[in-house]
Design a protein with these regions (language model features):
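C-terminal motif of bacterial Sec signal peptides marking the signal peptidase cleavage site
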Residues: 19-23
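Bacterial N-terminal signal peptides that target proteins for export
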Residues: 2-11
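Mid-length scaffold segments of soluble, non-membrane domains
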Residues: 85-111
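Short beta-strand elements
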Residues: 158-173
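Post-signal peptide N-terminal segment of mature Sec-exported envelope proteins
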Residues: 31-54
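Short, solvent-exposed, Trp/other aromatic-anchored flexible loops in extracytoplasmic proteins
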Residues: 89-92, 109-159
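Contiguous beta-strand segments within globular domains
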Residues: 58-88, 95
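Bacterial signal peptide processing site
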Residues: 25-27
Length: 173
């Protein structure tokens, strides 16, 4: 009787562990990609290629790639990595009143949208602000996409969309 109870408890613990680990894996690789023509039209209509803010001009520089470099633990996933730079083209420091909040990458009718993390590039000059997302969809490489970032004014809460068109998705080997 005692052995049967222990076996049942072990089975329950094993099932709980399987459920928990499965849900963590799903969250780790969840990607928000939608097909929404209204959202796409809104993004394009509100986007600019140069943002004028506090007497400075800003543009977006974007690097998109998938890392196929061998080494380290073997990965099943090769997500799209987006490294974006808000660049003050007047070479003045980026305003502390600007907050880069969201990324949109448009691949024909598909839109990947995601939050951005602080960039990891060393020695970025103060007229550039680097942000990163390393968990994008597994789209083909050597295709052109449009990249948009959403920027918020911390003073007025106004939101701006800044676009860079025809950015190539590179493959790192």
């Amino acid at each position: 009787m005692k052995n049967k109870l222990i076996a049942n408890l072990n089975l329950i613990m094993l099932l709980c562990l399987a459920i928990l680990s499965g849900s963590c894996e799903k969250d780790r690789y969840s990607v928000d990609v939608v097909t929404d023509s209204e959202m796409k039209a809104d993004i394009y209509s509100r986007s600019v290629d140069t943002l004028h803010f506090e007497s400075s001009r800003y543009i977006l520089e974007a690097e998109l790639y998938r890392d196929f470099f061998p080494g380290g633990p073997v990965q099943k996933e090769r997500p799209l990595i987006a490294s974006v730079y808000l660049v003050n083209i007047d070479s003045l420091p980026v305003s502390p009143n600007l907050d880069v909040q969201k990324l949109y990458v448009i691949n024909n009718d598909l839109i990947w949208y995601a939050a951005l993390n602080q960039g990891v590039q060393p020695n970025v000059p103060d007229f550039k602000l680097n942000k990163l997302n390393n968990n994008g969809p597994e789209w083909d490489t050597d295709i052109l996409v449009d990249v948009v970032i959403e920027i918020r004014s911390t003073q007025t809460n106004e939101r701006f969309l800044l676009m860079a068109k025809d950015i190539n998705i590179d493959a790192l080997w």
